[in-house]
Amino acid sequence: MNTVRVTFLLVFVLAVSLGQADKDESRMEMQEKTEQGKSYLDFAENLLPQKLEELEAKLLEEDSEESRNSRQKRCIGEGVPCDENDPRCCSGLVCLKPTLHGIWYKSYYCYKK
């Protein structure tokens, strides 16, 4: 009976000691991973502002190339009265005489082509 107790005690001691070793090993691995993660975060934190500055520079460069005259002037939407001589309907719309509605107010409206 003593041999059984000694055997179980020996197995128990080995299991505890190996379990503790595994726990220490996993703790070390976690520390290494967090240190690597921190280095990746530092790298990303340094890279992000650089990318943002590059994008901002490109956008500002494009804005400076455009002149005020190259922008599209305000246009009139669909179903809005327009002037026959100076139609400012948006792209895809044409200034036409209405068929039914609007004949009482103005003579021309913007319609789809």
UniProtKB/Swiss-Prot annotation:
Protein name: U11-theraphotoxin-Hhn1a
Superkingdom field: Eukaryota
Task of the protein: Probable ion channel inhibitor.
Signal peptide: 1-21
Intrachain disulfide bonds: 75-90, 82-95, 89-110
GO MF term list: sodium channel inhibitor activity; toxin activity
Region feature (Disordered): 59-83
Biased composition regions of type Basic and acidic residues, renumbered to the chain: 59-69
Family: Belongs to the neurotoxin 14 (magi-1) family. 01 (HNTX-16) subfamily.
Domain notes: The presence of a 'disulfide through disulfide knot' structurally defines this protein as a knottin.
InterPro entries for this protein: Toxin_22
Propeptide: 22-74
Tissue expression as described in the entry: Expressed by the venom gland.
Cellular component GO terms held in the UniProt record: extracellular region
The keyword Signal appears for this protein: yes
UniProt KW keywords: Disulfide bond, Ion channel impairing toxin, Knottin, Secreted, Signal, Toxin
Record localization: Secreted
